[in-house]
């Protein structure tokens, strides 16, 4: 990864906006590494800015519910990160809208920015950015793997087998696969 990049582009998706709204507390999901990595990388050089792309993926309007951007803002505040170094892009529903709005910012991001998202989502995000002529350097986080993968032997594998976890993984895989197909067809 190049050392001299100016912008850290973070895709939303690690925030539990509904839970955060109800509890009035910061609530993140298993993709929270996206936010954590952005702060870590931004703190390496004081001139780096974070561009947070988020909104709500809900197709229905939800009153009195904060969105991903509001939760991310709370996260940055809670870790004492200077909000003047964060550009928040709101009101998007998916990665295509996120990256289209990023392009409209007219910042000098070409080859000067890294893209942080979950490893499982990176292929689709880069495909979209390529279709939009955005050159972003990938920085994958949130790698998903078998827990306790250090164990070996059939008995131990059988003990780790979980239908629910496997169905969640399969759901994630098919969602990304359908997303990639949709991008290739529609863009």
Where are these regions (language model features)?
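A structural signal for short, hydrophobic/glycine-enriched beta-strand patches
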Residues: 1-159, 163, 167
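A transmembrane-helix-recognition feature enriched in membrane-embedded lipid enzymes
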Residues: 166-187
């Amino acid at each position: 990864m190049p050392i001299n990049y100016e912008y850290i582009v973070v895709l939303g998706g690690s925030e539990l906006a509904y839970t955060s709204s109800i509890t009035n507390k910061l609530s993140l999901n298993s993709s929270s590494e996206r936010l954590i990595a952005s702060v870590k990388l931004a703190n390496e050089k004081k001139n780096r800015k974070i561009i947070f792309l988020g909104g709500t993926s809900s197709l229905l309007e939800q009153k009195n519910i904060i969105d991903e951007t509001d939760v991310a803002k709370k996260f940055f505040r809670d870790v004492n990160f200077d909000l003047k170094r964060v550009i928040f892009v709101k009101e998007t529903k998916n990665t295509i809208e996120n990256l289209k709005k990023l392009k409209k910012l007219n910042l000098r991001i070409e080859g000067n920015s890294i893209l942080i998202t979950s490893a499982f989502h990176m292929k689709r995000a880069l495909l979209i950015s390529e279709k939009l002529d955005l050159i972003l350097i990938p920085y994958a986080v949130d790698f998903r793997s078998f827990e306790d993968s250090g164990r070996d032997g059939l008995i131990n594998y059988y003990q780790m087998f979980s239908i629910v976890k496997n169905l969640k993984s399969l759901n994630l895989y098919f969602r990304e696969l359908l997303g990639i197909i949709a991008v290739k067809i529609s863009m």
